[in-house]
Amino acid sequence: MTLKHPLQGEGGLMDFENLHQVLRTLYTEMMPLVGNMTGIAKGVAGLGALFYVASRVWQSLARAEEIDVYPLLRPFAIGLCIMFFPTIVLGTINSVLSPVVKGTNQMMAAQTLDMNKLREQRDQLEREAMLRNPETAFLVSNEEFDKKIDEMQGLNPKHLVTITSMYLERGMYNLKKSMQDAFKSFLEILFQAAALIIDTIRTFFLIVLSILGPIAFGIAVFDGFQSTLTGWLSRYVSVYLWLPVSDLFSTMLAKIQTLMIGKEIAALENPAYIPDGSSVVYIIFMLIGIVGYFVIPTVAGWIIQAGGMGNYGKNINQTVQKSGAVAGAGAGAVGGNVLGKLRK
């Protein structure tokens, strides 16, 4: 699975998908390294089991009590998990959580497909609306532009002024579209980069937790370190859930855009409506998506409590708030100035 999202352009999309796939391949290729830690973990767990069993047996003998065998099975159960860590532990967790990932990915794919269909319908209706208006038809159609030029052939000064004005207006329209497309492409790159950053951090965390997992299980055998086992499990599940949370966030953005595009289509179906061709709403959602991707770790932490991730979540949220404020202010100022000048 890859971290996909609905707010994405066609150019360069394949490159980003390849990078996400590289991260998936990296996780798979790094899993054999778990075996290198198994031997060390066995030694740690064996030493811990020796102290654990000896302590429990000595306490029972000192108190002249019967030896309770059931608690003594804990080190052996953990040792069994260490011996078959990739299969019993990682395989079980990934198998249980995989349907969640697939379910959220299907939700996102369905919403994105509906949004893309509505977007194509909106673009077609917008073009038809501009073609219906004689004052804007020549801006989007070369045939209409050539037709108006042919109607004003001659040396009439009035026609020359009109033709010059048409060329200038068409040039400004094309310049406006080009600048809007360039600004959208820039935001799309930032959006893709945000998704790639989250995916890279997620993959790194999963690899570290997977490779060093046997060591964590071995340490958990010792008295006083029992919480290491539950801490490792909660952190692994929390990081693993970053992907379905990301898909749910993308699904929400796609649904909101679907509703917005639906309203635009309803307005464009009115013959009296004249579209302005601006992409302000799209740009706003791009900015929301860029900042929103960095709160995914916090939301995943709400699903399952992972105490050790608190500092990371706090730091990354503070960093995002600062950088988001600066980036949002800069992008808003630039976008506002550009769109303001173009509308004039």
What are these regions (language model features)?
Residues 5-6, 20, 159, 312:
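Histidine (H) residue identity feature
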Residues 1-13:
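N-terminal amphipathic/basic-hydrophobic helices that include classical n-h-c signal peptides
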Residues 11-121, 169, 173-337:
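Hydrophobic alpha-helical segments involved in membrane association or supramolecular assembly
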Residues 339-344:
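Short, charged juxtamembrane terminal tails flanking transmembrane helices
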Residues 99-170:
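Membrane-interface interhelical loops and short interface/amphipathic helices
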